[in-house]
Amino acid sequence: MIKKYVEENEARMLEELFSLIRIPSVSAQPDHKEDMVRCAERWKELLLEAGVDKAEVMPSKGNPMVYAERIVDPNAKTVLVYGHYDVMPAEPFELWKTEPFEPVVKDGHIWARGADDDKGQSFIQAKAFEYINKHDLLKHNMKFIFEGEEEIGSSSLGPFIEEHKELLKCDVILVSDTSLIGADVPSITTGLRGLAYWQIEVTGPNRDLHSGTFGGAVANPANVLCKLIGDVTGPDGKIRFPGFYDDVEEASKEERELVASIPFDEDEYKKSLGIKNIFGEVGYSTIERTGYRPSFDVCGLWSGYQGEGAKTVIPSKAYAKISSRLVPHQDYKKIGQLVVDYFNKVAPDTVSVKVEMLHGGYGYVCPIDFPAYKAAERGFEAVFGKRPLPVRIGGSIPIISTFEKLLGTKSVLMGFGLESNAIHSPNENMPVDLWKKGIEAVVNFHLEYDKEA
């Protein structure tokens, strides 16, 4: 019955989703401020159409929040759905095969920025609610909170939660912003990595210099920066910041055995990424490296002349944006200062170095023995025909740990993305069939949760 409803309403549902995707709600770029408001307002309209009692766009210190609720019984359990309506920048535009903010369905996939992360996935939650509400199947209360700053650190949501604890009070938080192991291998995310993000600025001479007149006599900030960040990771994949691993907890033997049982084709992995070989911390599998171990990566690097042709200069400045994915028990503030101190200490006196931490967040581990998790297991099993595997993933949703800290509530991460969906990259996409299965699985979660509750 659920499947039939989704099939019959597919065209309408997709067009509703596309109305969200067409709004370029890029939180990282200030010139999209009006788009953030437009997207929040559109979410409000769609949630009201889906059947909530009330929906409102609420102010925060940054981009607005979208809050909605459907209260069937004040004494019943309450599920709070969290999602985000902001998206990553679409650049570089020239690498897209379609227009990033003009969604199309091609080869069975939705192609657009936000098709997966997180408009497509949040919309799964909204349409699942629409179904159970319309068919009088909702036996617990539902609340929704969608923010517009997840991709830039969720700095406004923590204070908003603190201010509106009673409004957001719930028994479990349901999130669709993660991935499956494979389209036919369901999984529930039981762990997220934390995050720390910095910008480094290296300054040398007071202006760009002629590379013939000054080359070999003056330190080149670009060369220095490359050396500084290149020295951070050793050939064994270890990160060399002193004290970086102090709070890293090793996975247990049982956890490592579970990870080893997860289907993973290394050759297919390399082929899908277009790489000849993998790299990472020696002694750990790829899945362990991305879910159980911390990482360090350059996210952006720029300096000097970047136009067409040649310009022989020693640049005055060089910049890098770097991130570190952290594991539970690592404190992003502690790591943040540790990295700042390290670069200031090792930088040569031929340049000056400025390291600024831009944002960060804590990791999260979800228990697998509480009622909502069991309901999610059965929700997946009803649609995919097999029990989902519990997995930790490499991404970060820092606000999840904040929810637990401020509301005392656990989260269940029912994600429906795939690695091949290219989130944060050109040609982001979402398989339509998997998207529809997601709606079915979330509907079944709610039905199973009522049995548990």
Where are these regions (language model features)?
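N-terminal helical capping/dimerization or prosegment-like subdomains
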Residues: 1-93, 317, 334
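A short core secondary-structure module
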Residues: 159, 215-236
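Flexible glycine/proline-rich, aromatic-decorated loop/lid segments
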Residues: 187-203, 417
